[in-house]
């Protein structure tokens, strides 16, 4: 049997889900990716009511962490993720699992890069992993409460 179904509605793995050419510029000059295919999600939900739906590659690629990575020696130009509002909408429809690993890796990598830039003499993992863990914890808290809508539902 099948326990859950991962459908393709416009997400993809990694930090480069969309090219700048696929996006539009908003009033603030920020690239906005195309909308997810909610029509496909709604059709699958109609045909398989109550069936667990999964979204792979659904990181929002927080720009504050992309900027942190880039500021402290990384090179991630054009990293664009799925807007959190769209992920929230997917969670409100039928999606029960949304994979956001790239967001966590960005938070950890950016924080560690910043730590080493500010403390080049340090080498103890207990020191540089402490702020990285704190940022990941805060990011997960934000996602659970504000994006995924699953805080307190364990």
Model-inferred region functions:
Residues 71-72, 82-154:
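C-terminal alpha-helical cap/extension of soluble enzyme domains
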Residues 9-13, 59-61, 102-106:
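Glycine-rich beta-alpha junction loops
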Residues 1-52, 63-68, 72-80, 84, ...:
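Alpha/beta enzyme core
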């Amino acid at each position: 049997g099948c326990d859950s179904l991962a459908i393709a509605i416009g997400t993809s793995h990694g930090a480069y889900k969309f090219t700048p050419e696929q996006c539009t510029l908003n009033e603030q000059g920020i690239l906005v990716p195309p909308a997810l295919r909610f029509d496909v999600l709604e059709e699958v939900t109609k045909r398989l009511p109550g069936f667990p739906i999964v979204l792979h590659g659904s990181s929002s690629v927080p720009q504050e962490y992309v900027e942190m990575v880039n500021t402290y020696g990384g090179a991630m130009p054009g990293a664009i993720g799925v807007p959190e509002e769209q992920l929230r909408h997917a969670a409100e429809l039928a999606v029960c699992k949304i994979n956001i690993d790239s967001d966590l890796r960005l938070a950890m990598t950016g924080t560690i890069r910043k730590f080493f830039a500010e403390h080049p003499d340090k080498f103890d993992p207990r020191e540089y992993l402490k702020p990285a863990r704190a940022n990941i914890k805060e990011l997960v808290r934000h996602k659970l409460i504000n994006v995924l809508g699953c805080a307190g539902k364990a």
